[in-house]
Amino acid sequence: MSPVINRFAFILSEKERKENRKISYSDIFQETGIATSTLSKWATNKVRKYDADTIEKLCKFLECQPGDLIVFVEK
């Protein structure tokens, strides 16, 4: 397992809770242009390369900082 993981699913669930609504990958795609297949990889921590443009769009959508989204876990 890579020591770099993302917290996309957790932060998305927090946003859903705060806004009291379910947010689909289609909703995110409509607002960000990020493919639903890419969002699925983020949600399941199967991202192999972290693209700066994708990170920027996710951070804007989720209203978070890159350091909130991607973390390094020491083994």
Give a label for each model feature.
Residues D53-D68:
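DNA major-groove recognition helix of helix-turn-helix/homeodomain DNA-binding modules
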Residues M1-D27:
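A short, Lys/Arg-rich alpha-helix, primarily the initiator
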Residues N20-K41:
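Short alpha-helical DNA-recognition segment
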Residues L39-S40, T44-K49:
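Short, charged early-sequence alpha-helical segments and their helix-coil boundaries
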Residues K41, I70-K75:
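Short, charged recognition helix plus adjacent turn
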Residues N20, V47-Y50, F61:
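Helix-turn-helix/winged-helix DNA-binding modules
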Residues N6, D51-D53:
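Short alpha-helical elements of helix-turn-helix
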